[in-house]
Amino acid sequence: MKTRLEQGLSALHLSPPPSGTLERYCSLLLEQNQMMNLTAITDPDQVVDLHMLDSAALLAVDDFSGKKVIDVGTGAGFPGMVLKVLEPTIELTLLDSLGKRVNWLSELSAQLGAAPVECIHGRAEEQALLEGYRDCYDLAVSRAVADLRILAELCLPFVKVGGRFLAMKSDNCQEEVERAGRAIAKLGGQLRPMAQYQIPGTEITRRVVVVEKIRPTPKGYPRRFSRMKKAPL
């Protein structure tokens, strides 16, 4: 695991964190996964490739140094916690709707020496309406499996004007991106050229949809999630 991580990070032009922090993250994830559902991926090498290195690749897409970042629908902490471990100057918020996961993430950040990390149990469509969260972040990131029109409505309200929303997607997302153009514009965003990368040591190619926030998201967004699903923008 250690060699695979080091080689993968080197291929991404990143230095491994001290004290084997990411290896410890892998081990703690797999240990906790026996007690609660954190990931369907249980092979250690695949955890390295599909969680750790996939998340780390985002550091080549944008400058995260010293930035205020929110990871929406973080799950087991991907990509946010990996980004924080590799770039400790990030001011990180992890948001997830499952309380048990959020409690574990809070413990994990301390175990990895990544604290302080703000871990919030909540729904994005409600959290984005609150003062101190709306229009406050330099970067919103998400690896959540959801249509980009819905992800944009959930994530863009968190981003301040001049900031960016980064959505991690599969390589065949072009149609989805084109379909989301109208929604992104309505929410105050503007599509920028997508980034593309290959996960080191694999044949898997991924894309990152880059959206710049050029004006405030109008009042009334995000809507209730049921409404988003029923009538995407």
Residue ranges, per PLM feature:
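Conserved hydrophobic residues forming the short capping helix/wall of the S-adenosyl-L-methionine
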Residues: 9, 33, 108-109, 181-184
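Conserved alpha-helix/loop element of class I SAM-dependent methyltransferases that forms part
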Residues: 31, 35, 47-65
